[in-house]
Swiss-Prot record:
The lineage of its organism: Bacteria, Pseudomonadati, Aquificota, Aquificia, Aquificales. It is an enzyme of class 1 (oxidoreductase). GO terms for molecular function: glutamate-5-semialdehyde dehydrogenase activity; NADP binding. It comes from Aquifex aeolicus (strain VF5). SUPFAM superfamilies: ALDH-like (SSF53720). It is found in: Cytoplasm. Its EC number is 1.2.1.41. It comes from the Bacteria. InterPro entries: Ald_DH/histidinol_DH (IPR016161), Ald_DH_C (IPR016163), Ald_DH_N (IPR016162), Aldehyde_DH_dom (IPR015590), G-glutamylP_reductase_CS (IPR020593), Glu-5-SA_DH (IPR012134), GPR_dom (IPR000965). Belongs to the gamma-glutamyl phosphate reductase family. This is Gamma-glutamyl phosphate reductase.
Amino acid sequence: MNYIEEKVNRARSVLRELTSLKTSVKNETLLKVAELIDKNRDYIKEENRKDVEKAKEMGLRPAVVDRLVLNDKRIDGMVKVLKDVASLPDPVGEIIKMWNLPNGLKVGRMRVPLGVIFIVYESRPNVTIEASSLCMKSSNAVILRGGKEAINSNKALVNLIKEACRETGFPEDAVQFIDRSEREIVWEILKMEGKIDVAIPRGGESLIRAVVEHAKVPVIKHYKGVCNIYVDDEADLEKAYHIVYNAKVQRPSVCNAVENLVINRKILKEFFPKMAYYLGKAGVELRCDEESLQVIKENPKLSFVNAKPATEEDYYEEFLDLILAVKVVDDVDEAIAFIEKYGSKHSDAIITENYTKAMKFLREVDSAAVYVNASTRFTDGNEFGLGAEMGISTDKIHARGPMALEELTIPKFVILGEGQVRDNFGVPEEWMKEF
């Protein structure tokens, strides 16, 4: 048996045990992991230091190095995630719905685990804890393959998870870690139909496309977050200033940050100068269509704003930076058409006080999360009250939006009967009398 087969077979070997595991054991294990992480901060930070130093030697970008770092604040965050997941209701075995048929059968849907989940992710070691905790609580086995730049940090965290499992009786084979860096291992696992139930990539668009290209197993994903905010002519502009500013400036490098600002032409000259001023003060570069760029050029107070003409490609771009593309439209219909063409079906918002337009936007914008008068930055499992998340899905099969506990289960039909047979087609009565 080779390295990959052993890892996958170990994960599959505990699926039945996981399904029948008591919620109390799952919660106890998660809390034990939290305790061990809290107690072993020095060990975690020492292993993490090796990764950070190696990353700097390799010349990785500062943003990548920053995502690698595990300081006390981020360790506190991992401890909180574990405690939060432990406090959430256990979805496994929940009967979602039950109904009675005329023949007396009771038909229902029960939540059951997906099975073996393969997580492929990049530089953030926090994902090791987020993914493991969600899979453990939802009775899934997980195979973790983090980026090679975080291998020591991830190993340390998995060691603590397995130590907790041994102490509480949770099957430790439910958490498998790929501690080799060859890409070929990832491609081989992605082809293991029947053994891997689903793959979930977390990272940049190039990683996700590579996973989809090589996979023969189902993949739950989103390629990128080109989020849009439309400011309607009936918007409360005070709300709009704060919403747009938050969605772009608070944390520009995440997938739920806004990338395109769409403005109704009727309010362009009233709304955009102030908005451009606030964004410019925050260091945001604006890529404007002709009309919005002219507004900036005509206003001497905006001479400091870094604004340039937008290209067609800009509206498709996930900048993940302090850059915002701007487009002027006639009405809500044109705004929706723009979002349909350039957006990525992640998160989009309308700012308006008009109920009819708001409902039209909610119905017609085909995205995983659609907002009225709120920032797109809320698209997140914790912010939605779901607890930690495995990532955001923009797929239309199985799950859409934040992938939290319930999204790591699937419904199966359960049928309760009292001897019913279809069309009364049972053993003939005379045969019953003969023997």
